[in-house]
Amino acid sequence: MDVLFSIAKTVSDLKKKVVVGTIYTNVEDIIQQTNELIRTLNGNTFHTGGIGTQPQKEWNFQLPQLGTTLLNLDDNYVQATRSVIDYLASFIEAVCDDEIVREASRNGMQPQSPTLIALASSKFKTINFNNSSQSIKNWSAQSRRENPVYEYKNPMVFEYRNSYILQRANPQYGNVMGLRYYTASNTCQLAAFDSTLAENAPNNTQRFIYNGRLKRPISNVLMKIEAGAPNINNLTILPDPTNQTTWLYNPDQLMNGTFTIEFYNNGQLVDMVRNMGVVTVRTFDSYRITIDMIRPAAMTQYVQRLFPQGGPYPYQAAYMLTLSILDATTESVLCDSHSVDYSIVANVRRDSAMPAGTVFQPGFPWEQTLSNYTVAQEDNLERLLLVASVKRMVM
């Protein structure tokens, strides 16, 4: 992997720096590095493709050395360099595409394609120019079964869920109480609802509890907690739990209430939050949200009409809350909304009409991967996202 990364980094730097008018001394280092790369690759033959619709191709390396000059780079020099850049970039993309459509139930983080396996041999170690990439460091640590650290913005840690839990419901569902929840990507939205607005609750306070669990623990979490839940704050016709009928979810947001969020790691309480705003949590893999809906001591006639004593109840009072994971670190590779690498992998596998593998579901859906995130999937995903990041460098 480090050899492929070094080739891609060299090509990327060469493409950026070799332009008409540049003084040669400013690009001399990258030119010499490219020539070292060419000397090492020349005389070797590699094969890519052959899976799905990917064409088989043979790469016979006989590239010319890049010359030197005492002057500024002219158009002829740049054109000659471009031909080398284009060949190397095409080679890298072909290797990456070939690697992306392969998976293994064991040792999935190790190279799987013939070319990447060949590049891992000792004869190509002189190409290892740059090993400073955090992706390479994480892959190296993971391959040694150490604990890498991945940093994510808006990490996709929540499985997609859009449902509700009923704590009370009459046969006509005109008097209901329960918890509506929506989780997806990096957000968890909750709405504790009650048609009677805690009318008969002890001390006019109705309690709701929601328990959630992540597939992988996250650490150094920066989180935003705010009132409201936009995805579930709307008039909705919902099926009843037995799918025999439907009922009307018609929430009116209530500000009277309190909440407590408890964060746990391996069953041990780690942190507790009771306030809105931006908060930090050291680490957690599960959480419990307790909401207390409080009936106001006094209400205007307009509010009383929304929740008439004894019914009928056209609305539900709803205390709403949204948790958003802004930043976090993990020891597991995840899909990140700020990176296109996962999309690159999914698109290559789809466009190549890749046959169904033994590790991931057809179509490479993140939701299904996250819902049953196995060690084999994590190992393969580590490799695939690294390869996608290499391909992105030369695209």
UniProtKB/Swiss-Prot annotation:
- Localization per Swiss-Prot or TrEMBL: Virion
The coiled-coil regions, if any, are none
Q: Which GO terms describe its cellular component?
A: viral envelope; viral intermediate capsid
Question: What Pfam families does the record tag this protein with?
Answer: Rota_Capsid_VP6
The protein's GO terms of the molecular function aspect are: host cell surface receptor binding; structural molecule activity
Q: Which InterPro entries match?
A: Capsid_hemagglutn, Rotavirus_A/C_VP6, Virus_capsid_a-hlx_vir
Q: Which UniProt keywords apply?
A: Capsid protein, Intermediate capsid protein, Virion
Subunit field text = Homotrimer. Interacts with the inner capsid protein VP2. Interacts with the outer capsid glycoprotein VP7.
Q: What does this protein do?
A: Intermediate capsid protein that self assembles to form an icosahedral capsid with a T=13 symmetry, which consists of 230 trimers of VP6, with channels at each of its five-fold vertices. This capsid constitutes the middle concentric layer of the viral mature particle. The innermost VP2 capsid and the intermediate VP6 capsid remain intact following cell entry to protect the dsRNA from degradation and to prevent unfavorable antiviral responses in the host cell during all the replication cycle of the virus.
Q: Which cysteines are joined by disulfide bonds?
A: none
Classification of source organism: Viruses, Riboviria, Orthornavirae, Duplornaviricota, Resentoviricetes
> Which GO biological process entries does UniProt record here?
fusion of virus membrane with host plasma membrane
- What name appears for this protein in its UniProt entry? Intermediate capsid protein VP6
Family per UniProt? Belongs to the rotavirus VP6 family.
State the superkingdom: Viruses
- SUPFAM superfamilies assigned: A virus capsid protein alpha-helical domain, Viral protein domain
